[in-house]
Amino acid sequence: MLDPKFLRSELEMTAERLATRGFILDVERLSKLEETRKSLQVATEELQASRNAISKSIGQAKAKGEDVAPIMAQVGSLGEELDAKKTELAALLEELNAIAMSVPNLPDESVPTGADESENVEVRRWGTPKEFDFAVKDHVELGENIGGLDFKNAVKITGSRFIVMKGQIARMHRALAQFMLDLHTTEHGYTEAYVPLLVNEDSLLGTGQLPKFGEDLFHTKPATEEGQGLSLIPTAEVPLTNLVRDTIVEEDNLPIKLTAHTPCFRSEAGSYGRDTRGLIRQHQFDKVEMVQLVKPEDSMQALEDLTGHAEVVLQKLGLPYRTMVLCTGDMGFGSAKTYDIEVWLPAQDTYREISSCSNMQDFQARRMQARYKGKTDKKPSLLHTLNGSGLAVGRTLVAVLENYQNADGSITVPEALRGYMGGLKKIG
C-alpha cells in the first residue's frame, strides 16, 4: 500500500499519477475524510487532556477534604465522550485504510505512459525466429502425437484448463524446472526454498492479492473463529516474500535472493474464452519464481539484474525472445515498474509472455511491515521487494516443443537440457 501520510499530503499529485494507470482516486471523498480525521484527532486529544487535568484535581480535592463526587461525575462524563470519539476515529481510520488497500502502486517516473498493452515499449530482442521448411504444428498437436500431453483425461479427472503429462514430455517438463533452479542457485546467487502451497489471508494481504483479487484465488478453507482461511498460492512470490513479514532484517544480510519451484493455482476469473487451447493458460501450472529483498537505493538495479536472470534461461535454451517495459496502464496492481519477457511461438507466429519481472518498491513491505536496519540507524526502514518468473515451466515447455520441432514430429532436445534427460538428443 502507499504511504498514508504521503497520500494525504500529496493527494492531487497522487491522483494525477494514478490516473495514468487508469485508476481514478476519489479526491473529494478523501479530502473530506481527511478533514474529519483531523477534527476527530484534535477533539480526542483535547478530551484526553481535559480528562487528565480534572483527574489530577481529584487527589487535591481529597487532600482538602472536599466532596469529589461532582469531579468524579465530570471525569466519567468526559470518559464516555472520549470513548465515543475514539470509536468514531477508529471507524474512520478503518475506512481510510480500506481505501488505501484498494489503491494501486504509483508508477515509477521511468515507466512509459500508456493506456494498455498496445503501448508497451520493446527495450531489446534476442535471437532470430527459425524459418521452417515444413508446416509447423502447435504444441498441442506435437505433444498429443508423441503421447505426452493428455488433455482428455485431465478434463475427465478435473475439468478444463488442466493437463496430464506423461513419458518424455513429463520428463522434459521436470528437466526444465531443475535446469532453471540449478541456473539461479549456482550462477545467479539465489537460495532455493521449499514453501507451503497453502497460505493464510495475512500473507495474501501482504503481497497484494487480497482484498482486491480474491476471485482469482482457489480458497480451500474459509475463515473461522479459530483462524484465518487458507488459499492455494497463485505464485511462489506469496510465501517467499512473506518470509520477511513482521521482520527487521540486518542490513548486512541484504540483498536476500530466493527462488522456488512450485505449482501455482489461478482461477483465471477474468480470462473466459482466452487461450482455451493448450498449456498457455491453465488453472494449475508450475513456475520457478525469483524474489529479491533489497535496500531502496538498490531496487532499480536489482530489477535489471532479476530480469536479466530470467532472460539467461531463454538464452541458454536458444529460444528467441523480446523484453518489453510495461506502460502505466498495463502494470500489475502492486508494481512500480515491470518488464515482460515474451518468447517466440512459431505456431502462433508471435511473441507470448513467459515471464513478468516487477519492482514493487515499498508497496508490499509497508503492508507486511518488512523492514531492515543498519548498525548506525536509529529506526528501521522499509525494504523494497522484487519478484519475477524464472520461468513459467509450462510455457517454456510450449516454446521448446514448437521451436525445436522437426518435420517428422519429433522434438530436438536443447543442449542445456540433455544432461537432465539422460543424454537424449530427441524425443518422439
Swiss-Prot record:
Residues binding ATP: R266, S267, E268, E353, I354, S355, S356
Family per record: Belongs to the class-II aminoacyl-tRNA synthetase family. Type-1 seryl-tRNA synthetase subfamily.
Reaction equations catalysed: tRNA(Ser) + L-serine + ATP = L-seryl-tRNA(Ser) + AMP + diphosphate + H(+); tRNA(Sec) + L-serine + ATP = L-seryl-tRNA(Sec) + AMP + diphosphate + H(+)
Job of this protein: Catalyzes the attachment of serine to tRNA(Ser). Is also able to aminoacylate tRNA(Sec) with serine, to form the misacylated tRNA L-seryl-tRNA(Sec), which will be further converted into selenocysteinyl-tRNA(Sec).
Pathway assigned to this chain's UniProt record: Aminoacyl-tRNA biosynthesis; selenocysteinyl-tRNA(Sec) biosynthesis; L-seryl-tRNA(Sec) from L-serine and tRNA(Sec): step 1/1
Principal location listed in the UniProt entry: cytoplasm
Quaternary structure (record): Homodimer. The tRNA molecule binds across the dimer.
Entry-linked CDD domains: SerRS_core
Protein name: Serine--tRNA ligase
Record's keyword terms, sorted: Aminoacyl-tRNA synthetase, ATP-binding, Cytoplasm, Ligase, Nucleotide-binding, Protein biosynthesis
A Pfam family assignment: tRNA-synt_2b
UniProt GO MF annotations: ATP binding; serine-tRNA ligase activity
EC number: 6.1.1.11
Protein encoded by which gene: serS
Record flagged with keyword ATP-binding: yes
Coiled coil: none
Recorded GO CC terms: cytoplasm
Membrane-spanning ranges: none
InterPro entries assigned: aa-tRNA-synt_IIb, aa-tRNA-synth_II, aa-tRNA-synth_II/BPL/LPL, Ser-tRNA-ligase_type_1, Ser-tRNA-synth_1_N, SerRS_1_N_sf, SerRS_core, tRNA-bd_arm
Primary enzyme class: ligase
Positions annotated to bind L-serine: T235, A236, E237, E289, S389
Localization annotation: Cytoplasm
